[in-house]
A protein has these predicted regions:
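Conserved phosphate-binding/catalytic region of the ribokinase-like
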Residues: 1-5, 192-291
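Glycine/charged-rich beta-loop-alpha catalytic/anionic-binding loops adjacent to active sites
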Residues: 9-18, 62, 226-236
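Short, conserved phosphate/pyrophosphate- and ester-handling motifs at nucleotide-, phospho-/glycolipid
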Residues: 35, 177, 244
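Hydrophobic packing within well-folded, soluble alpha/beta domains
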Residues: 35, 44, 61, 119, ...
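Substrate-binding N-lobe of the ribokinase-like
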Residues: 6-7, 17-89, 96-102, 291
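Ribokinase/PfkB-type carbohydrate-kinase core domain
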Residues: 1-8, 60-62, 68-70, 86-226, ...
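Nucleotide phosphate-binding site architecture
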Residues: 15-16, 182, 282
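Cofactor-binding loop segments of dinucleotide-utilizing enzymes, especially the Rossmann-like FAD-
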Residues: 12, 46-50, 153
């Protein structure tokens, strides 16, 4: 997409093993997929194994039109076993010692990062020393003017205070959900109700935007100028896998296109609500959602 804003998802790329079959996943990958659908020049920095699952991922990314900075390494391609509860809420078992635990960005990936308008990352891929170092160093190469989106994505035991603190220091956008914000508050000794905690986090860090998503209970966007709250649309939920990642993509697309905060928020909410009505994390977005 010549002339489009350049965005990166760096971190895990994997197969979500859902009850009905496997789906391409990983939060930064889902973000990149939806960002591409929203007209951004989208890329993924990650790793896959030298196996059939890895080759399938590379082919999927290519067919989706996403720029691939995905290395093949001597580890198995990542998988996540997912079971859905009666409300379509996923429970994850994230397998360890896999390819995306050994991310080493190529020279071409770093060159792309040097020109990036936004980069999205989380805690999960930083569970290993190799990928932690690679992600932290890649963040240093992104222009100061870029959006550095820390979509915290706390999973299982794969996060700690050091990862969160060092990531937040490099971020200027934080996305966090209603469960994660309570864990965050406990780790960093922040007290108060949800709204007070949200504002303390925003005030204590150099953030342009804080996004708090609360599932069926709505969402907040906080900026220096205003707060925006929106209810979650009442939709028939197939599953919620990838809904938060699509919200992040909508948020980033709106910010890069300099839209008003309320308009950005509405778009992000509508995108994530649609994703909840579909199976898997990366359904094709209808045109009216992308406008």
């Amino acid at each position: 997409m010549k002339g489009s804003k350049k965005v990166i998802g760096i971190g895990e790329i994997l197969w979500d093993l859902l009850p009905e079959g496997k789906q391409l996943g990983g939060a930064p990958t889902n973000f990149a997929y939806h960002a591409h659908q929203l007209g951004l020049d989208s890329s993924v920095i990650s790793g896959v194994g030298k196996d059939e699952l890895g080759q399938e991922i590379i082919q999927n990314i290519k067919e989706a039109g996403i720029i691939s900075f995905i290395d093949s390494v001597d580890k198995p391609t990542g998988t996540v076993s997912i079971k859905l509860d009666k409300n379509g809420i996923p429970n994850y078992v994230i397998h360890e010692d896999v390819a995306w635990d050994f991310i080493t960005p190529s020279e071409s990936a770093i060159e792309f990062a040097n020109r990036a308008d936004a980069i999205c990352f989380g805690t999960l891929a930083q569970r290993s020393e190799t990928s932690y170092y690679s992600i932290q160093e890649t963040l240093k190469t992104v222009p100061d003017t870029a959006l550095k989106v820390f979509d915290i994505n706390m999973r299982q035991r794969f996060y700690n205070e050091t990862i969160i603190r060092n990531s937040l220091q490099k971020a200027n956008v934080l996305k966090i959900n209603d469960e994660e914000i309570l864990v965050f508050a406990d780790i960093f000794g922040i007290s108060g109700d949800e709204f007070e905690i949200m504002h303390q986090i925003f005030d204590n860090h150099q953030l342009k935007i804080l996004a708090l998503t609360k599932g069926a209970r709505g969402s907040w966007l906080i900026s220096q100028e205003e707060d925006s709250y929106l209810d979650t649309p009442n939709v028939s939920v197939a599953d919620t896998v990838g809904a938060g990642d699509s919200f992040t993509a909508g948020l980033v697309a709106g910010l890069l296109n300099n839209k008003p905060l309320k308009e950005i928020h509405r778009s992000a909410v509508d995108i994530s609500a649609f994703v909840c009505t579909q199976k898997g994390a990366t359904p094709i977005l209808p045109d009216h959602i992308k406008e």
